[in-house]
Regions:
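A structural signal for multi-pass alpha-helical bundles of membrane permease subunits
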Residues: 2-286
Length: 286
């Protein structure tokens, strides 16, 4: 077969890529340069939306900082807990298969439905959490206190998506070669030293991939915030995606929402690239 003819087989995939990725991005860029809202058409206004975003909308940047905090915190906790659980069931323990399935249950549930259940759990007067804590003289305002509301969002996100991290890390642990562990056992290495000097370094490439995947997903936190707190109290848990939703689908400032979306996309691409390079340099330094 002629080498050039092989490119013919790439065309179907290329068309799909253009249809689901490139065209929407081009449309968003075009939309961001317009003043399209509930009463104006797709009229071209140049960079006015971007000027407004960078000079006259601190709320967007505050929501982005809030998103960064929530994303980084949840992913760190998911990684630590997920690695601990994966390491536990990686070893030969009783009911190993049962625990592997049990730890995956949160990921199998529908996020929106589970968030509604969590909202009921943390209800100030009707929730079982405060019913228990009231016996100790405590009644935290989980969803109406700015600090506790962030903490509640983190709890729900960690519970929902730690199983995904657990699954990736367990797959990585099961794929590790046995020879380094046998050599460490012969040398008399303790379990802690085995983990620090054998398991963790061997898992570094998988850890980097798992963290980046979860950061990408965590940076799009929307459903949890929408159902659990609606961005409140005030704007205490409002993330960038939720703020874009408000501007675009509640206030119908579609052009301005598109400019925020494109700016957000560029920032996330740059941020995740830097994070990936830093993690690679730190974890794969040897």
């Amino acid at each position: 077969m002629n080498f050039k003819h092989k490119y013919v087989f790439l065309f179907p995939g290329l068309f799909v890529l253009i249809g689901i990725l490139i065209f929407p991005i081009i449309f968003v860029v075009r939309l961001s340069l317009s003043g399209w809202n509930s009463y104006n058409g797709l009229n071209f206004i140049g960079l006015e939306n971007y000027i407004r975003l960078f000079t006259d909308d601190p709320r967007f940047w505050q929501s982005f900082l809030r998103l960064s905090f929530l994303s980084v915190t949840t992913v760190i906790l998911q990684y630590v807990i997920g690695f601990a659980l994966a390491h536990m069931v990686w070893k030969d323990i009783k009911f190993q298969r049962f625990f592997r399935v049990l730890f995956l249950i949160p990921m199998m549930t529908t996020p929106v439905i589970m968030t509604v259940i969590w909202r009921t759990f943390f209800h100030e007067s009707l929730g079982p959490v405060n019913d228990i804590l009231s016996n100790f003289g405590m009644s935290p305002k989980w969803l109406t206190d700015p600090v506790l509301a962030k903490f509640t969002v983190i709890i729900v996100e960690v519970w929902q998506w730690t199983p995904f991290m657990f699954l990736l890390l367990l797959a990585g642990l099961l794929s590790l070669p046995k020879e380094p562990f046998l050599a460490a056992a012969i040398d008399g290495a303790s379990p802690v030293r085995k983990f620090l000097y054998v398991t963790f370094p061997l898992m570094a490439p998988i850890s980097i991939g798992a963290i980046i995947i979860r950061l990408i997903e965590a940076s799009k936190i929307m459903d949890t915030v929408y159902v659990l707190t609606s961005g409140g109290p005030g704007t205490a848990t409002e993330t960038s995606s939720f703020y874009i939703f408000i501007k675009g689908l509640r206030e119908f400032q579609m052009g301005y929402a598109a400019s925020m979306s494109f700016t957000y996309l560029i920032i996330m691409i740059i941020s995740l690239t830097v994070i990936a390079k830093v993690l690679t340099k730190v974890l794969l330094k040897d």
